[in-house]
From Swiss-Prot:
Pfam families: KIAA1328 (PF15369). It comes from Mus musculus (Mouse). The gene is Kiaa1328. The lineage of its organism: Eukaryota, Metazoa, Chordata, Craniata, Vertebrata. This is Protein hinderin. Interacts (via N- and C-terminal domains) with SMC3 (via central hinge region). Residues 462-477, 555-568, 575-585 have a biased composition (Polar residues). The keyword Nucleotide-binding does not apply. Disulfide bonds: none annotated. The keyword Ligase does not apply.
Amino acid sequence: MAGAAGPFLPGSAFWSRDFSDEDQSVAYVPGISTEGNTRSRVKLINPKVDVKVKASRVTDASVSMESLKGAGDSVAEQNFCKRGMKSASLKDLCLEDKRRIANLIKELARVSEEKEVTEERLKTEQESFEKKIRQLEEQNELIIKEREALQLQYRECQELLSLYQKYLSEQQEKLTLSLSELGAARAQEQQITKKKNTPQCSLMDLDGSFLSVARPQNYGQTKARPKSANQVSESFTELRNNSLRPITLHHPKEDLERMSTKTRTCTYESLGRRLINAAPIEKSLPVELKIKEYPNLPPTPSSQYCGHKCSESGAYVHENYHPTNMAPQCCKTHPESCSHCRIPWASQMHDRVILQPRETDIEKQLSEDRRQQLMLQKMELEIEKERLQHLLAQQETKLLLKQQQLHQSRLDYNWLRTQAMFKSRELVADKEFPKPDLDMNGSVSGPSLWKPKCDGWMRGTSTSFKKCPDSPNSGQNQREKKTVEFQSRVENGIQWTCQQNDICRPQRETVTGVRKDASTSPMSTRSPKEPLTPASLSSQHKTSRYETSLLDLVQSLSPNSAPKSQPHPSRAAGTWSTLRPTPQKSIWKKVGTRRSPEDLEENQILEDIFFI
């Protein structure tokens, strides 16, 4: 190493080569070439010589730096620093220092990259903030403009409101003026009506020229008839001849401006019948006819002037036509003033326009009357509705009763039909009575053996019938009668078996087989001496309709047995008490020699039900 460092200058950097460089491991550092990047970890042979060389180098470097500082040249100083740094060998650094340097270089590169990224990000954020600031400024300007527009609209609305208030005040003033004028006009009209309502003789003496009749006389002074009976009859003949001509009412010239003339057409069926009016106002033509026929009568208060309908004056000419007493009726039915409003007819004829408000009041009264009539009709309808609802409830109850009766009649009919079927089966059973049976001991059962049993059975049944209370159901009584009749039939059958003893003697050899069958038979061991109870009778009635199906089930379940096998006589008596119409062979097929215990149990249950 000392030989290698000889030819180089003391301030220059150099790489030393040892013989052991090839044996050392190579450490890779990024950014640095691999040449001369190895360092021996073995101690040097002459360490003192190396230290001396290093000391000489340091002294030479210090001398050169002092000379440069004395010159004061900054550029030369920097170059010298660089040379000094170059003269420092990386070989002197350990692996940890090299790694630290590499990490620092990496960190510097990473920091520079981050710096660029942050600068770019800051630029973008600055641009976005500037855009947002511009947008906010624009929005602020828009808000200011809108505020100014709203202020202008508010001012315009205030101006319009002030104008509208002025207009309303003017209209209110006009209304108050018009109301005051109307009030003054009404007060004047009321004063005029009060003045005209006062009785005046000049107004009472009316000129009837505008009605095409003569001048009327004073109604209160002259009570005599205005015309004779002949004149009245002539006027009615004219009406009869000219019944379809239009009758016109002539108004004075003063009233032509206020009210137009009205033409009404009427037809008359006869003089004694009422008038059929085709005009919208009822009972107006008889008043006009009275004016023509009786000029001294005051005008009636019908729909012409007052508006109050008088029932007596409406049909006066036709219904109350009597020539002798015409004047008194006129005196009674036509007073000088209206009975409702007490206003003279003269003032009403001259001032019809003034009385129009009164006519409206009268119409209101009429509407109230109609309303009351409608309310009465409504109440009557409600009462009728309640009555109809009551009748409907009664009819529903009757219908329910009838339905119950019909149901009961159907039940009775079904019961009678079952009884009739039962009777027909009894007749079939009587015709197909079974043959005599053999006793279990091998001897033919005689009357001495059967009669006591049957007598006891009959006594038991009779006592049971006596113990049963009398029920209102007629079917139970019929069943009792049937059982009594069947007892007599059983006695006859027993006598018949006693007479046939000689015929059945050759069959004693089959008794042993019968004993075996009887020992394994599922028949019930109930004795015939047991009395019948009311519960048994009711159960017999309930199970009567199911007996045929039970027999079929028993026959289908029981296996085929010997046809010559005979049952026990007590069992035969039990079958007679059940009143079955089937023959003997079909019943006694149930006794078999080859049966399973389950079949025996099922047959026993079914036979118990059957014998009950």
